[in-house]
Amino acid sequence: LDMEEEDFLSAELEIVPAGKARDCGLDRSMVIGYGQDDRVCAFTSLFAMLETENPERTSCCILVDKEEIGSVGATGMHSRFFEDYVAELMALTEDGNPLKVRRALRNSYMLSSDVSAAFDPLYADAFEKKNTAYFGRGLVFNKFTGSRGKNNSNDANAEYIAKVRQVLDNNEVGFQTAEMGRVDLGGGGTIAYIMANYGMNVIDSGVAVLSMHAPYEVTSKADIYEAYRGYKAFLKDIK
């Protein structure tokens, strides 16, 4: 490589574990690999979007960066790039009224696709066993996330949750509901609250992950498949 020391001044390095993702478990029912938070949700969301034909509502899949440090910067969800794109689309209509941009955002439905913490028997005290995610039970929904209760979280309303449930039930998609660990012990943040600030209906959904943020994370193949099916059903049938 024709590289000099000064090139590192403007380099952007992405250093990750060298091992490839592989089967895990005696029955090979799981996947082990680095960065499944949140590649596993990006993968399922993108494929669901690409394979959805002629949805009744205008649909999109947004892949954003910097969630772990507050969704800041030009590529984080706090950036106004999505709002700008909606405005650009509205400007192409006969009436480019800025008020319609806000109405379009407010009338939108969103699944905030992010992983959830799978129950870990080695750290059972960190979970509420009757309200946590388990492997093999399907797509996970979190009514709220945050930490210390609902701090810095979105709180999905009951009517929207019922609407999403109906879509999944009609398409026979396996799903479960969960918290992100016990109150005052667990917790985690997503981008859901940012989009909810527009008034749109948002709920967190994703795949349960074991050993989240470890060099190698573990997910269930069945859950990955149900996430893909659930996202596709949402794009096709949400009204």
Where are these regions (language model features)?
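Short acidic, glycine/serine/threonine-rich loops at helix termini
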Residues: 26-27, 71-76, 121-124, 216-218
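Flexible, glycine/charged-enriched surface loops at secondary-structure junctions
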Residues: 2-12, 55-61, 95-107, 168-182, ...
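Alpha-helical metal-binding/catalytic segments enriched in His/Glu/Asp
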Residues: 32-73, 80, 84-85, 230-232
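Soluble metallo-hydrolase cores and metallopeptidase-like ectodomains found primarily
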Residues: 1-33, 51-52
